[in-house]
Every structure is written in structure tokens, then in C-alpha cells.
Amino acid sequence: MRQLTPHEARVLATLMEKARTVPDSYPLSLNTLVLGCNQKTSRDPVMDLTEAQAQAAIDTLKKQSLVFEASSSRVPRFEHNFQRGFGVSEPQAVLLGLLMLRGPQTPGELRLNSERWYKFADIASVEDALAELKARGDDSGALMVVQLARTAGMREQRWAHLLCGESLLMPYQQAGSGDAAINPETEPVSLGQAERLQQRIDALERQVAHLYKELGLSQA
């Protein structure tokens, strides 16, 4: 299957989201779909699709059998066929949908953000589904997800989808790893890191005090 464009990914993922979170309003009309695509919350990046752009994405997705038009309504309404189209399991489809909507996320973030979509038992089950996606590809053999390098200031590695290719990942990829030194003027320090630094400082102060005592010196 060919790579999706950003507009196609947003349209597809929005249909996936609304099917689970507002089933009474699903399938979606074009107007409702555009509003969902352009939400200011739970979207990364935020987009400003026009109805014409959304319709163009729908037309292409229909040709790939990833979107269908409901036939029981006077107003055209659309529904997705993602899980069958990509041949993935339900939890895998949920994770790919969230990654398309919200950008790269850690397993913990994915579990939290999936609450209204699907109930993962724990973070380990999220990690298992991601690992399965990483180990396989789509029907053309192309990779579907990638684990990004851990950046300074982050405890967990983030995951990203590859359904639109790798070029969209550039803003999220930074040089270095979580083991690199952190510059407090440019990188945020987490609470856990601050606690570990304070513990090391306290330990060093105790060692210095012990040395002064053994040498019979007094600290200024």
C-alpha cells in the first residue's frame, strides 16, 4: 500500500477516533469530519483543512478501500476500513490511529490517550502491540512504526507511525540520547532527575564531612 499524505492520515485517523468516541454521530458527514480534523486539542500537528482538501483525501482513500461512503443517508457520510485495509489487530489499529492524530508518544502516553478508544490492561500490553507492529510491515513490506531515539530530559522513548513515510518525523528527531548530559539552561529537568541529582549532592557532602573529621579539620 502506498504512503498516506498528511491530509489522508488526518482524515482516516479522525474517522477512527469518532467511530469509537462518538458512535451515535458515526459515520461522519463531510462538515463534521472537517471539524474533527481541525480540532485544536488532541492533535499534533494542528491542521486547517478545507472541505475541498478533506474531500480530495476521502476520494483517494475510497480508491484504496480505506474509506467507504454510507449509502443509507441523504447527506453523504463516511466510515473507515482501516483495520481490514491494513490487516492489523484492533489494539494495533488503535495505536496507529493515535499516532496519526497526536504525533509521537511514549507507551505510557499511548495507554492514557487510548482510554476512550480501547482498554489496554497495562503499559506492557501497549509495548507488546508496538513491538508486533515494528516486527511486521504492511502488505508491501513497508515498516509501520518506529521507535525514536530517547532525547535528553525524557525517561521513555517515543514511538511514531511511518504510514506517511519518514520525512514527517524530522521535527521530532533530535541528536543525542537519554544518556547525554543535560544542559539545565536549554533542557528541562524532570522531577526524578532532580531528586537523583540532589541525592548525589547529599552523598558527596557526607563524604566531604567524613574526610574533614578524619583529618581533624573544621569546615568553614
Swiss-Prot record:
InterPro entries: DUF480, WH-like_DNA-bd_sf, WH_DNA-bd_sf. Pfam families: DUF480. PANTHER family: UPF0502 PROTEIN YCEH. Belongs to the UPF0502 family. This is UPF0502 protein Pnap_3223.
